[in-house]
UniProtKB/Swiss-Prot annotation:
This protein binds specifically to 23S rRNA; its binding is stimulated by other ribosomal proteins, e.g. L4, L17, and L20. It is important during the early stages of 50S assembly. It makes multiple contacts with different domains of the 23S rRNA in the assembled 50S subunit and ribosome. The globular domain of the protein is located near the polypeptide exit tunnel on the outside of the subunit, while an extended beta-hairpin is found that lines the wall of the exit tunnel in the center of the 70S ribosome. The gene is rplV. Keywords: Ribonucleoprotein, Ribosomal protein, RNA-binding, rRNA-binding. Pfam families: Ribosomal_L22. The keyword Ribosomal protein applies. This is Large ribosomal subunit protein uL22. SUPFAM superfamilies: Ribosomal protein L22 (SSF54843).
Length: 127
């Protein structure tokens, strides 16, 4: 009766997780996203655990969610997963007012960002 299910956007050997409305500027979030691109998930998790950036905690949660999606929803082997994509997008920007001297005002921008992580299963072929 209802609509047919939409075809899967990702290939069968990939899984995705999205973290929306992270309270950090996209530039700062991209610094941490660059850190994990192309790495095996075990190495990426270790890098995020020891990163001193505040947002690394949220990126780690998103990566763990992508790993769980791969394991539980798509039956992929966790040991063979690699971070295929980790990209950042802009979300909304809250605008605030800061009173300054002589009756002036300054605008404070509080940006938000979205993070998408795609993991792919890469099987090691026997050579």
């Amino acid at each position: 009766m209802g609509k047919a299910a939409a075809p899967r956007a990702l290939p069968e050997n990939e899984a995705k997780a999205v973290a929306r409305m992270l309270r950090v500027s996209p530039q700062k979030l991209n610094l941490v996203a660059q850190l994990i691109r192309g790495k095996k998930v075990a190495n990426a998790l270790a890098d995020l655990q020891f990163s001193r950036k505040r947002i690394a905690v949220e990126v780690r949660k998103c990566l763990e969610s992508a790993i769980a999606n791969a394991e539980n929803n798509h039956d992929l082997d966790v040991d063979d997963l690699v971070v295929k994509e980790a990209y950042v997008g802009k979300a909304l920007v809250l605008k605030r007012f800061h009173a300054r001297a002589r009756g002036r005002g300054a605008r404070i921008l509080k940006p938000f960002a979205n993070l998408t992580i795609v993991v792919r299963e890469v099987r090691a072929e026997a050579a």
